[in-house]
């Protein structure tokens, strides 16, 4: 039996998570994205859901930083901080 290609995801399933492309690129977004996924997995959140939550939180953090004119991700918004702690984008 052939092994699965290394590009396959969790449980041998490729999952795609399209999102909007923002017109900005800020330092810290990759750290926030990866950290959110790892935190979700550590709490038992299934991988596809952890990715979706990470996308939502990262997008919101970028929007917030862009609105402030910041040059990096800003997590000072109380709503974002609560969502990060709870790993719930709503």
From Swiss-Prot:
Swiss-Prot/TrEMBL keywords: Nodulation, Plasmid
Q: Which GO terms describe its molecular function?
A: catalytic activity
Report the InterPro entries cross-referenced here: Ribokinase-like
What does the record give as the function of this protein?
Answer: Involved in nodulation of a particular host, M.lupulina.
- Name-wise, this protein is Nodulation protein NolS
Specify the species: Sinorhizobium meliloti (strain Sm2011 / Rm2011 / 2011)
